[in-house]
Amino acid sequence: MATPSSVASSSSRDQVQRIHRVTRENRHLWYQLTVLQQPERARACGSGMKANSDRRPVDPPPVVELRIIEGPSVEEGKDITFDYNANFFLYASLEQARTIAHGRVQNGATNNPPILTGVPASGMAYLDRPTEAGYFIFPDLSVRHEGYFRLSFSLYETTKEPKDFDLEPADSDLPPGVDWRMEIKTQPFNVFSAKKFPGLMESTSLSKTVADQGCRVRIRRDVRMRKRDGKGSGFDRRGEEEYSRRRTVTPAPAEDPNLRARSVSNASEHRGPYMPQEPPRRPSAAESYHAPPPLPPPPPSSYDAPPPAARPGHLGFGGDHNMPPQYGAPAARPYGHPQSAPIPPATPTGPYPTSSAAPSPYAKQDHHHQQQYSYNSRPPAPSASPAPPMKHAMYDNRPSEPYVPHSSPSVYASTERRPSYANYSAPAPYSTPASQPTYSTPASQPTYSTPASQPTYSAPPPAPYSAPAPPPPRPSMSQSSLAPLKIASLVSPLPPIEAQTEPLPPPPMLSTGGKRKHDHVFSQNHKPLYNGQRQLDAHYGHGYRGLTPEPDQGLYSRADGQIGVVTFNQYQV
């Protein structure tokens, strides 16, 4: 007769239950059941036909361990689980974890217990891990209704050998068969509705260990917990998808509307080193430099009518050699160095204004010439000018068209003339700013304050100015730089030319390659084709129209539309 033993209290989550039984041969057997894995949560699967196929198993699956010990006590006995010849199975049932008070009126819902679906019975599996024992696994247990429940497992034994029967059978009238041995209960767990279910957890290490040994257990590698964002109830699938997209997709950075595209002009890199070293200018020139008008008048020419004294400067690159150079690159300027006394405004002044009496009215113009010669020494770099870029493009597209002086000098002349100097650009040795000597102001010249960021100029009123002789030529200058010059344009005035106001004609279309269009090679026949007809080849040779080639020849179409003939080699079969 099996007698229940005292339940061993344990501080862990495992619950242990033991019984003691004496067989006919006076063998003392101890049965010990341990719930190794307690159920924690489940989702109610509901009722109906859909609930039969859409199972919601208890998570994690319950696992119960059975040990059979033979001896006077559990501590002194021997484990005979693998040697004992009998069959065991464990049956699971569901019961309420809270005591329900019965009312006066008994209805059907009160009498019926909670419904447990799935596979409630489990046979014993002999496993080596985690320890050598018998295990009952319930991977397919579902609950139909939500609530607070616990599972109750009943152990049944089918005895095979007569010596292992009970010493005192429970009912002598019945033949020996399946005997109920003991019962053990799990800890209470919650069954949630579909809206409140928090989700399935990752499979435990015990479930993975059992599954590795061949038992049927569902293994989940990832955590399928629901992200609720603080919501207590309700489940919105669209909200979950939106949350997943927000969690995984990185938003693109917002663009600043105040930022503009980078300019393609590299004029600032050339203009930067010369900003603190600009020569004196007229106040009107400085004001116009700060605020240039959108469409200035045509500039005056500095090559139109120089006096005869300036010719040696053009051909010999400077007259007197007693004046030190002010800039490295402008020293080799082979054009536009007229030297004369104060003359009407239409005539340019000396090449390099460094007089101590007063700044020249055209100091800004000559200084822009100097800067332009330095800029143009680098052919790919555009000129650094505050004038509108439309004027630069208009003059650069017409490099061979000269300009004539206006009726009065303009403070924007140098700004507009710089693009036209591309025809007379200095050779490459003068393009390096590091090779240019530092600009030095003579002692007799007034001092000006020139900040690095935006220069401001203060100059006395203009006075007659006598231009000194140009500086001596650089040692590296050669006469070969005179090749692009037109002496006639330097010594003879040109007729006045009005500013061009109409847009330039569109440039001619250039061929991008030798590939012909499809229409030039193949004929376009838009008629429908029937009975195996094909498109008509207009370039097919007239000599082969509708004829079959010789047996030893083949025809092929070339890329130019002609028909080629190839002769095959003669061979014997």
Swiss-Prot record:
Location within or outside the cell: Nucleus; Cytoplasm
One Pfam family from the record: Velvet
Keyword Glycoprotein: no
UniProt feature, compositional bias: Low complexity: 352-363
GO cellular component entries: cytoplasm; nucleus
Main location: nucleus
Biased composition (Pro residues): 291-310, 341-351, 379-389, 458-475
Domain Velvet: 26-220
Positions occupied by motif Nuclear localization signal: 40-45
Key word Transcription present: yes
Biased composition, class Basic and acidic residues, residue ranges: 230-245
UniProt-annotated stretches for the region PEST: 476-504
UniProt-annotated stretches for the region Disordered: 222-520
Domain of life: Eukaryota
BP terms from Gene Ontology: sporulation resulting in formation of a cellular spore
Keywords: Cytoplasm, Nucleus, Sporulation, Transcription, Transcription regulation
Residue stretches of biased makeup (Polar residues): 432-448
Induction remark: Expression is regulated by light and darkness, but this regulation is further modulated by the carbon source in relation to the growth rate. Expression is under the control of LAE1.
Disruption phenotype: Leads to light-independent loss of conidiation and impairs formation of perithecia. Completely impairs the expression of cellulases, xylanases and the cellulase regulator XYR1.
PROSITE patterns: VELVET
UniProt record similarity statement: Belongs to the velvet family. VeA subfamily.
Stated role: Component of the velvet transcription factor complex that controls sexual/asexual developmental ratio in response to light, promoting sexual development in the darkness while stimulating asexual sporulation under illumination. The velvet complex hat acts as a global regulator for secondary metabolite gene expression. Regulates expression of the carbohydrate-active enzyme gene clusters.
Comment, domains: The C-terminal PEST domain is a region rich in proline, glutamic acid, serine and threonine residues that is required for the light-dependent regulation of development and secondary metabolism.
Subunit structure: Component of the heterotrimeric velvet complex composed of LAE1, VEL1 and VEL2; VEL1 acting as a bridging protein between LAE1 and VEL2. Interacts with LAE1.
Name this protein carries in UniProt: Developmental and secondary metabolism regulator VEL1
Organism lineage: Eukaryota, Fungi, Dikarya, Ascomycota, Pezizomycotina
